[in-house]
């Protein structure tokens, strides 16, 4: 209530003590906020009917939220959002929440994790938008969450289908390799999508693929 009334801004760490979460987000942090145009991402959401909710961030960028009907593995949410990075043509280093899939450190201690500012501060700041970039009232936002919430199964199936479609026209050399290589070599070229960190990402994933195959 204090957050909605503008008295205290609240951040949430999505991953709980059991390594589960009910939401995640991609943090699109543009290099130049003045020239940032969210329409590019809103168009992709609409065209591919993605179950994500775009929300204006505190800094002026865009957060792409996904919600689930129940607690699911934080790793499943991260995996789904990592696939979306390819779909949106975002760099691999783009921030994804939850940042942790477990709060237990290597020393056996508990980590507090990384927090993300939640939307609708004072009810009119960091608000959700539709694919036409129209701001949504808080009550509408809650209804949109309910309509877009996924189960663990539908989340995984949706992500797999997205990658399969993106791989159409992929390089045959990587048919038995990870999706990222096929997408970089063929799928993204077909969709006229460019990855800013394409070379480094390709080299890393190729080495992983080659080590396992040969």
Regions inferred by a protein language model and the residue ranges of each:
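Signature for HUH/AEP ssDNA processing cores
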Residues: 1-60, 67-83, 214
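Alpha-helix boundary/capping residues
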Residues: 3-7, 84, 145-148, 188
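Glycine-centered flexibility motif
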Residues: 6-13, 57-61, 89, 111-113, ...
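A residue-level signal for conserved active-site and pocket-lining positions in enzyme catalytic cores
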Residues: 26, 118, 207
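Modules that initiate DNA replication and primer synthesis
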Residues: 31, 61-62, 66-77, 114, ...
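Flexible helix-coil linker/hinge segments at domain or subdomain boundaries
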Residues: 85-124, 145-158
């Amino acid at each position: 209530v204090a957050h909605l009334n503008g008295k205290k801004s609240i951040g949430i760490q999505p991953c709980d003590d059991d390594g589960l979460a009910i939401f995640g987000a991609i943090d699109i942090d543009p290099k130049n906020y003045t020239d940032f145009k969210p329409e590019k991402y809103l168009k992709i959401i609409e065209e591919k009917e993605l179950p994500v909710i775009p929300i204006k961030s505190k800094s002026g960028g865009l957060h792409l939220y996904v919600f689930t009907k129940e607690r699911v593995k934080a790793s499943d949410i991260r995996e789904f959002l990592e696939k979306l990075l390819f779909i949106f043509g975002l760099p691999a280093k783009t921030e994804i929440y939850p940042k942790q899939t477990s709060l237990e450190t290597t020393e056996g201690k508990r980590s507090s994790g990384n927090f993300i500012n939640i939307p609708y501060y004072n009810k009119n700041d960091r608000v959700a938008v539709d694919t036409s970039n129209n701001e949504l009232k808080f009550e509408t936002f809650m209804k949109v969450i309910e309509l877009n919430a996924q189960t663990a199964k539908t989340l995984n199936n949706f992500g797999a289908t997205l990658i399969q479609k993106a791989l159409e026209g992929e390089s045959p050399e990587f048919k038995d390799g990870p999706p990222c290589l096929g997408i970089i070599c063929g799928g993204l070229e077909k969709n006229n999508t460019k990855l800013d960190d394409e070379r480094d990402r390709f080299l890393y994933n190729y080495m992983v693929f080659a080590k396992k195959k040969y």
